[in-house]
Amino acid sequence: MDAALQSLSRFVADCAVLAPKVVNGRFGKMDVLHHRPTTSKLFLRKTIAAHSFSADEINVHDLMSDHPSFVDMYFCYSSPTAWAIVMDYVPCPDLFETLQTQGALDNALVVNIVRQLCDALNDLHNATGYIHNDVKLENVLYFGARDRVYLCDYGLCKREHSPVHDGTLEYFSPEKIRRHNYARSFDWYAVGVLAYKLLTGGRHPFERSADEVLDLASMRRRQQYNDPAALKNVRNLMARDFVFCLTRFNFECRSTDYKQIAKHSFLASRHDYI
């Protein structure tokens, strides 16, 4: 047995699964592992059926391994029916869970989170040529004690210009709905939707009521707005304009470039957060 297999074998033998932490998702099962020799060290293991596995997920882990906003991977192994990825366990809630407990976040915290998220996406785009393709509340963690945003779950990442169409409908840009090839603009549009949700406690910019489930037809129709007043649930005018700039229907008028987005007055202005 070579050194890598020996290391993996020892690691698996030394870990205990914390059953209460198990989470089952559409593209895999996740459970938390307690590494007994180190007493307190926890790892997250994602198990993916072989037919749902994408090597791009491993590539992104490898390519972004030194980035503070990406989750470190320690092992990846497979059987004939499944793959498993063992990575750092980040002990904090995702943004969906945060909104469930805290409601709408204050502007300063939203700016802090969105700035870090934009930086992480820009680094992913420029360093690897990958599009995350599933930016949403559930895939972004904010660890308040570290003041650190983590962008996670790389299972739907694809190279720019790939002709694949996956993700979460309520974050789809008009071009993604029209089944254009992967583009960086997909991620930036999703950031606009995510920012709106943070500012409103989980509401979607195009829903008519808090309990409405948006379908494809509703998204197609309501994306064609051209007045920031439609985003009236966001009271701060700079914040409202930021969301508007990232979610405008007309691609030529929309903010789709990191430098342009980072200079927006909402992100560039000073806020008393820390």
UniProtKB/Swiss-Prot annotation:
Q: Where is the active site?
A: 134
What this protein is called in its record is: Serine/threonine-protein kinase 1
Keywords (alphabetical) are: ATP-binding, Kinase, Nucleotide-binding, Serine/threonine-protein kinase, Transferase
Q: Which Pfam families match?
A: Pkinase (PF00069)
Asked whether the keyword ATP-binding is assigned, the reply is yes
**SUPFAM superfamilies linked to this entry:** Protein kinase-like (PK-like) (SSF56112)
What SMART domains would the database entry show? S_TKc (SM00220)
Its top-level enzyme class, in one word, is transferase
